[in-house]
Curated annotation (Swiss-Prot):
Biological or metabolic pathway of the protein: Pyrimidine metabolism; UMP biosynthesis via de novo pathway; (S)-dihydroorotate from bicarbonate: step 2/3
Cellular component, GO, one term: cytosol
Catalyzed reaction equations: carbamoyl phosphate + L-aspartate = N-carbamoyl-L-aspartate + phosphate + H(+)
Gene Ontology terms, MF aspect: amino acid binding; aspartate carbamoyltransferase activity
Protein name as it appears in the record: Aspartate carbamoyltransferase catalytic subunit
Any Gene Ontology biological process: 'de novo' UMP biosynthetic process
Assigned protein family: Belongs to the aspartate/ornithine carbamoyltransferase superfamily. ATCase family.
Free-text function comment from the UniProt entry: Catalyzes the condensation of carbamoyl phosphate and aspartate to form carbamoyl aspartate and inorganic phosphate, the committed step in the de novo pyrimidine nucleotide biosynthesis pathway.
Top-level taxon of the source organism: Bacteria
Length: 301
């Protein structure tokens, strides 16, 4: 009986984009679109969802909380600075405790790559809100929804992911699923920050990226994950690898700019472009609520 509950929880949770087929992804996007259009779903009974954030977060944390409250869920907020993990309690024991006191799902962001492998014995769904440099599936889904709203289809689109790819869970979640959905993915940025991506994807210059991309997906320089923060000055990075006003002028009329945020203005993107006509950065944030409502419904229905 317990093994069946664990298997069901695994199926309803969401830890990586790779665990979902294309049809599942499209179904989730369809559900998200319905929520964005005003659809209502409520659980039949009182359900508690615990949000465990072990890393700083604004967009993801509050987006999940808004999604949970719109669905009529009871939200348990976890403060990692004042929790028993500070006394040495393991992530598993913390999660197991929340499961035992009645949490129906756990939303977790953790600095450790693939932390969720340690939680396979739980019988409640785990929703990954970001693991180290590994995965960020709900960010990927909201990015996909934003692209779908713009172009209706993914087939034939050229998406360039640019910036600090080696340290980006967003890049890892997006590159493969975009390819599976029919898009062509290229990468841009310092070759030192490409990690494994140049093994699979074509590396282009930033000027080429601006000219060629239907979707130019800029990534934050993750200074906190670099051993050497002084590899580039902010000004040098912006001129060599950022989206400057001059590069934006090279972009095709229909092309859009995306960024998972937070944005380092005048580093990845010129400040004047953050809210320009082709920017979809705040649309991405707005779409996060509908996407996370869809993911929570899938986990709890």
């Amino acid at each position: 009986m317990l093994s069946a509950q664990i298997e069901k929880a695994t199926q309803k949770g969401l830890c990586t984009m790779n665990e979902m087929g294309v049809s599942e992804v499209l179904d989730l996007l369809k559900t998200a679109e319905s929520f964005a259009a005003g659809a209502v779903w409520k659980p039949r009974m009182q359900l508690f969802v615990a949000n465990l954030f072990f890393e700083p977060s604004t967009r993801t944390r509050f987006s999940f909380e808004v999604a949970e409250r719109r669905l009529g869920l009871e939200v348990l907020q976890f403060d990692g600075q004042h929790a028993s993990t500070q006394k040495g309690e393991s992530l598993y024991d913390t999660a197991r405790t929340l499961e035992s006191i009645g949490a129906s799902a756990l939303v977790i962001r953790h600095r450790q790559d693939a932390y969720f492998h340690e939680l396979k014995g739980l019988s409640v769904p785990i929703i990954n809100a970001g693991d180290g440099c590994g995965n960020h599936p709900t960010q990927s889904l909201l990015d996909l929804l934003t692209i779908k709203q713009e172009f209706s289809s993914f087939s034939g689109l050229h998406v360039v992911i640019a910036g600090d790819l080696a340290h980006s869970r967003v890049a890892r979640s997006n590159a493969d699923i975009l390819t599976r959905l029919g898009a062509r993915v290229s990468v841009a940025g310092p070759i030192e920050w490409m990690g494994e991506f140049t093994d699979t994807y074509t590396h282009v210059s930033m000027d080429e990226a601006a000219r060629q991309a239907d979707v130019l997906m800029m990534l934050r320089v993750q200074h906190e994950r670099h051993d050497d923060n002084a590899l580039f000055s902010k000004e040098a990075y912006h001129q060599a690898y950022g989206l400057t006003e001059q590069r934006e002028a090279l972009m095709a009329k229909q092309s859009i700019i995306m960024h998972p945020a937070p944005v380092n203005r005048d580093v990845e993107i010129a400040s004047v472009l953050v809210e320009c006509k082709r920017s979809r950065i705040y649309k991405q944030s707005a779409n996060g609520v509908a996407v996370r409502m869809a993911v929570l419904k899938r986990a709890l229905a």
